[in-house]
Amino acid sequence: CAAPAENKADDKAAQDDFQSQILFCGSTSLYPIISSLASSFTEKYVTWDKVNAQFPNSHISVYVAPGGSGVGVKAAVDGTADFGMLARDIKDSEIESLGENYKAFVVAKDALTVSVNAQNPLCEKTDSLDTDTIRKIFAGEIATWDQVDASLPAETINVYIRDLSGGAYEVFQKSVMGESEVTASATQSASMTELATNIAGDPWGIGYAGFGAYNKANAEKKVLFAMKVDGVEATEENIISGVYTIQRPVMFVTGKVVSPSAQAFIDYIFSQTGYDVVVKNGYIPAFTPAA
């Protein structure tokens, strides 16, 4: 996540003591939210003096780069990005690396649904899987669908996961897999959108589609079916209450002192506009917009 070359010399005198360029990097789950808000913020104001009369007349540049939660934290730690985006809890070691100016901004709550293709005949047999069965499926210990339910065909179970740099991989490992490793035959996906699309295109697929990605995939037609986990459904109410346990925060962090311009954009993220974008992307807002 390196800063783009263009606009670096834009109003250089003003940039000596004013930050006109802001860079976010990391989680592909948070990426569409921040990217959408960066675009609307830039289109609305164009130059920083339109945001605040005390700011200089320099062009607004808010760059957002996907790369995964781990990449985002690293970029925030080494200073190649102002903010690292995560879709998991931040580790104590990462907080320590970010230093005394560490700050976290939680934008949304997300959960990992255990989703199968909506055409899978399993959906007619049961709407729930227990954690141990899920673990065995993802570990490859249960390899065909007839091992889940004897009435199903002996088709190979195709497992879909996020790539290893994604926050979801760590969340699922901690919440479900424990000491077990995900099967090496699992197909890795570069984003939650891709993961959901992969399951939707495979009648014998299963994967941990994020709540937001699941809702977006099913917006026009139900293509995914989320299994209850130990009888608990991944609903907004159950995620907020914590009853549905396979969940994660969606947030961004920094180790820098937040500049006035960055704070102005953060205020925009946590406004009604930001709230609406979070909802549009299928997530549960973790904030109440300022009046």
Stretches with model-predicted labels:
Residues 2-97, 102-291:
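Exported/periplasmic ABC-transporter solute-binding proteins
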